[in-house]
C-alpha cells in the first residue's frame, strides 16, 4: 500500500513539534511493515524544495508554504501579507504533488492546516487526524467562557 502523509513539518525542521514526531514514527513503522510511504511537508525555507530519502521514507519538502520562519527568511510586514495569498496556492501545490505520485492508496492529513479540505475530490481516501481537538471544542475552550 502507498500511504501519503501531509504535514507542515518533518524532522529535521525548525518548526518541528508533536505532528512532526508523530509523522516520523508512524511513517517509519509503516515502511518497516512493508508499505511504501511518502511524506509531503513544507520546506523551512519557502524558497526551496527538496526530495530526499529518510531511511526508506520518501520526503518531499515543498517550497511556497503559507508560513515563514523568521530566522530563515526574515520577518517583514510584506512577507506576512504574502502568506494570505499563499494559503490557497500552497494547498494547490500539495494537491498537485499527490496526484503526480500516481499510485497513492490513502492520504493522511492533520486538521491543523486545513489541507484536507482541498483534497476532498481527488479520488483517493483522505483521513483527517485530529492533533488539536480542544481548539474545535467551542464550549469548553471559547473566548466567551474566559471573559
Where on the chain are the PLM-derived regions?
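Short, surface-exposed linear patches
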Residues: 25-28, 59-62, 80-85, 128-131, ...
